[in-house]
Amino acid sequence: MNCRKYLLSGLAVFGLAATSAVAALSTDDYVEAAWMTTRFFGAQRSGQGPNWILDGTSNPTSFTKDSYNGKDVSGGWFDCGDHVMYGQSQGYASYVLALAYAEFTEVSTTFILVTTPTTRKPTTTPMKSGKPNKVRDLLEELRYEADFWVKAAIDGNNFVTVKGDGNADHQKWVTAGAMSKLGSGEGGEPRCITGNANDGFTSGLAAAMLAVMARVDPDTANQAKYLKAAKTAYSYAKSHKGVTNSQGFYESSWWDGRWEDGPFLAELELYRTTGENSYKTAAIDRYDNLKFSLGEGTHFMYSNVVPLSAVMAEAVFEETPHGMRKEAIGVLDLIYEEKAKDKIFQNPNGMGSGKFPVRVPSGGAFLYALSDKFNNTNEHMEMIEKNVSYLLGDNGSKKSYVVGFSKNGANAPSRPHHRGYYANEKRWRRSRRCSESSRKEQALGRYDCWRLY
């Protein structure tokens, strides 16, 4: 495969690529778009950091006192734009990112440059404004998250899946550093920690991520540390079922019984890393428990990892166990190609506000790219390029879905749903007069329903 294939496929996990329709974009433009997206994870850092989006504020660190049964469990990533850690989605995100790094190594290690930003705003910070530290940006982000999973995987009976309370977290619209100094009722420290939920999904995906890191991290000490933690997290996953229920934020019912993909993918990755057949045997035994009939009905996302399981099973087993399932590409076609409009992947409900989550085209592009990589083909490159370039502004409204990316006349997001972006450290509270319509606007980044406390 050529360098272009690696670049476009690797960027698919971020939702970034190019088509002939946006041919004016250079390779450097694609690299910068990927760098911008990688920075999002750096802005999600909890704990000691550094978190670049908090640089220059009065509170550059946050939630450094997180502990469970006396053990330090600080660090990791926040949920998108908020300050609670929900492992239900974080396990999914961390494994997918690690898998992208592992499988599309050329783009991960050649095109993602290493910089430590010196200014805060993503719309004004050029990629080369920072100082190289000789560690690839993406690897550095993965290490930050993996080091948290090492802490979270305490033993076979204790695994941290949630840090914080969503309702308390939404009381103030301030930076993570400012919020951590508020009382518990306003999302600050000390925070409630969930460390013994009946959850095999989150711990399973954390184990899968750690197993990948044990394989790809160039540091031998890290390899040993991550493999040990992967086995601990897997031990927890084997003895627990279901998904942590976070009422109103990540409800276990959203998974509709699709939790065994977590330990299944852990078994596959532990087998790939260690070569021990016991993990492969366990994965084969678990394969029939995966909810393919339910997973083929909706797109790839944190609550439906079935499509990824199909791709990975075919890659590891060469042919699926017992010959019972169709080939992985058939699963993907059912979810994506057959529901596409003008080759753009989307929800069955179509386009429009609330009906076009970015995860649909980016997730579909990533899965097709991954399948093509394992099968050594370029068969789906046109679809991959079409969908990911849509997110860079190659669409009817010239709308870019990447904060700060406005190349070729694309309209970048101007009000991202991310509290750190606004660097507000004052005490804001939700107005009682905040109507349902203004709440929807607030979710889009128009903060009319918040006022100074």
Swiss-Prot record:
Its EC number is 3.2.1.4. It is found in: Periplasm. Keywords: Carbohydrate metabolism, Cellulose degradation, Glycosidase, Hydrolase, Periplasm, Polysaccharide degradation, Signal. GO terms for molecular function: cellulase activity. It is an enzyme of class 3 (hydrolase). One of its GO terms (cellular component) is periplasmic space. SUPFAM superfamilies: Six-hairpin glycosidases. GO terms for biological process: cellulose catabolic process. Residues 115-126 are annotated as: Linker ('hinge') (Pro-Thr box). InterPro entries: 6-hairpin_glycosidase_sf, 6hp_glycosidase-like_sf, Glyco_hydro_9, Glyco_hydro_9_His_AS. Disulfide bonds: none annotated. It catalyses: Endohydrolysis of (1->4)-beta-D-glucosidic linkages in cellulose, lichenin and cereal beta-D-glucans. Residues 1-26 form the signal peptide. Belongs to the glycosyl hydrolase 9 (cellulase E) family. Monomer. This is Endoglucanase A. It comes from Fibrobacter succinogenes (Bacteroides succinogenes). The lineage of its organism: Bacteria, Pseudomonadati, Fibrobacterota, Fibrobacteria, Fibrobacterales.
